């Protein structure tokens, strides 16, 4: 399958239900599932290049895969929440649990691997630390430039731009603006940048272009401070130490969010993640360049 299929399901929340979209690649009845969860302001099409490479490599090995890339609620093809206070990791975790249960009902899941970029990795750590709540425990966990302890400077930078920007007169103007905001993504060709970021925008009724996500996702950062970040880090650290899944940590060598010190600490506790640092990249590696994709394929497809 060279293009994904868009599906939707309904997830419960404290105000009722909301609809979540997800992009599915590969064979819908494959028992090996890879769940790819995006970063804070991103959406499931971020993983297009990785999905194609992973499916091609699996086919060479004679293996069947089902890749699922959700649009976390408030983003992309998913609903916006009526209560913005629900834009937080526990809501997202519950939605992923619902999604996995639905996928398992469609076709039994024998193995579950998780690829999580930034926020998607936080959700992944929460899920992997509570395997009893999943239809299948996370077997392999790939954390893309994220960990239990995050730099306040990096979070403050994200806080400064999330929910800001636009509308734009054209799609190209929006994509160009993102190239400045997201310089940490590292070097990309113009074509790569367009493919990666065109799904970040939608055209409004008046013809201008706006971000695909609900600006209210920024409210989760309103009360965030250096002190609350430290408190949250302690909670996440305790959860990280409960994880038993085979874990690979990718870190952009220039990352503001995940310090080298914190990344090294992750190799010495909990699942004892294997660390790979990627030169010339900050937060976060986009998994588009071949040197970023290759370690992911090696990790997910090894026997």
Task: List each language-model region with its residue ranges.
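Conserved hydrolase catalytic core segment
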Residues: 109-152
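Catalytic histidine-centered segment of alpha/beta-hydrolase-like enzymes
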Residues: 281-291
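Catalytic histidine neighborhood in serine/cysteine hydrolases
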Residues: 269-283
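Conserved alpha/beta-hydrolase catalytic His-Asp/Glu region
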Residues: 169-223
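A short loop-to-beta-strand scaffold at the N-terminal edge of the catalytic core in hydrolase folds
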Residues: 15-25
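Active-site loop/oxyanion-hole signature of alpha/beta-hydrolase fold enzymes
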Residues: 14-16, 49, 55, 66-115, ...
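Conserved HGGG/HGGXW glycine-rich cap/lid loop of the alpha/beta-hydrolase fold
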Residues: 26-80
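Conserved serine/cysteine hydrolase catalytic core
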Residues: 205-265
């Amino acid at each position: 399958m060279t293009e994904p299929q868009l599906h939707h399901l309904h997830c419960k929340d404290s105000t009722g239900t909301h609809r979540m979209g997800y992009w599915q690649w590969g064979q819908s009845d494959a028992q090996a599932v890879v769940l790819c969860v995006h970063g804070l302001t991103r959406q499931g099409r971020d993983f297009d290049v990785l999905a194609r490479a992973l499916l091609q490599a699996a086919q060479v090995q004679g293996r069947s895969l089902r890749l699922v890339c959700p649009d976390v609620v408030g983003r992309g093809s998913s609903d916006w929440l009526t209560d913005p206070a629900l834009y937080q990791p526990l809501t997202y975790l519950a939605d992923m649990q619902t999604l996995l249960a639905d996928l398992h009902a469609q076709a039994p899941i024998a193995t579950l691997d998780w690829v999580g970029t930034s926020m998607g990795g936080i959700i992944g750590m929460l899920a992997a630390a509570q395997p009893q709540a999943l239809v299948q425990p996370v077997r392999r966990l790939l954390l893309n430039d994220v960990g239990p302890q995050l730099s306040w400077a990096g979070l403050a930078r994200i806080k400064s731009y999330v929910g800001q920007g636009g509308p734009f007169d054209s799609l190209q103007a929006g994509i160009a603006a993102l190239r400045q905001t997201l310089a940490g993504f590292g070097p990309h060709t113009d074509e790569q940048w367009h493919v990666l970021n065109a799904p970040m925008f939608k055209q409004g009724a008046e013809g201008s272009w706006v971000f695909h996500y609900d600006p209210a996702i920024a409210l989760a950062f309103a009360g965030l401070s250096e002190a609350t970040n430290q408190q949250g880090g302690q909670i996440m650290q305790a959860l990280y130490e409960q994880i038993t899944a085979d874990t690979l940590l990718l870190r952009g060598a220039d990352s503001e969010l995940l310090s080298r010190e914190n990344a090294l600490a992750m190799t010495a506790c909990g699942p004892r993640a294997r660390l790979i640092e990627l030169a010339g990249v900050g937060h976060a590696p986009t998994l588009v360049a071949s040197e970023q994709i290759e370690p992911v394929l090696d990790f997910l497809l090894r026997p």
